[in-house]
Regions:
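Bacterial N-terminal signal peptides
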Residues: 10-18
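Active-site-adjacent betaalpha module
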Residues: 25-53, 80, 99-218
Length: 218
């Protein structure tokens, strides 16, 4: 992930300079600088349609439409991917707040029979029937896409893995407002309770970072 590594190095330098300046002003002592490790590259995965679901988060107006990264990069990546997902017969579920449930962007709008979850927190599993509905359909793996990686995607991935789901996150279908926040989001996801620091493909009950062109169905 060249972009991520570049962002990490740049962000680390900025953080070090800012921290050093602040500490120098307050104490006059040398500062301690830290650098985040580089994220692993996305990996190829092969999924079984019968036990896989696509979970779509906040591709809605105005949340996605007001964010250049969501509208300009994420949406063009997820639109053809979703078409392939539906063609493979994968279950599709949607989660957003009540006020935006009717505002899904037309490129990725729900189809009849799709699961719809109204959430009150960023974790779509918290106080909803999502787990019940997915398990009733025999789902064990969730592909998670949407806005934003450091918010709903990160928290919902934790909610999924603690409920024994294996999670796949295509890195081109989620992001945050800044490159720095995007990297932090992916880092959080891989370092959650059921961590996958090396990004082992489809590590059970853990998150895996992949990409839309690296996900196939058998």
């Amino acid at each position: 992930m060249t972009q991520f590594r570049t962002v990490l190095l740049t962000s680390g330098l900025i953080l070090a300079l800012c921290a050093g300046a602040a500490q120098a002003q307050s104490t006059g002592k040398p500062s301690l600088t830290l650098q985040m490790p580089a994220l692993p590259d996305p990996v190829r995965v092969v999924l079984k349609p019968a036990t896989t679901a696509l979970l779509v988060l906040d591709y809605v107006d105005p949340i996605c439409s007001s964010q250049p990264k969501c509208k300009g990069a994420m949406l063009p990546a997820v639109t053809p991917f979703m078409a392939g997902v539906r063609k493979a017969g994968v279950i599709v579920a949607y989660g957003t707040r009540e006020r935006t449930m009717s505002n899904w962007l037309p490129e990725v709008a729900p189809a009849p029979g799709d699961i719809k979850i109204v959430n009150t927190t960023q974790d779509r599993f918290y106080n909803t029937d999502l787990d019940k509905e997915l398990k009733a359909k025999g789902i064990t793996t969730i592909i998670m896409v949407g806005w934003k990686v450091s918010g709903s995607v990160a928290y919902t991935s934790v909610g999924a893995t603690v409920r024994d789901y294996t999670v796949v996150i295509p890195v081109d279908t989620t992001a945050a407002s800044t490159d720095y926040e995007t990297v932090i989001g992916f880092y959080q996801i891989l370092n959650q309770g059921n961590s996958n620091l090396t990004n082992e493909p489809l590590k059970p009950k853990s998150p895996t970072l992949s990409r839309t062109d690296m996900i196939t169905f058998q």
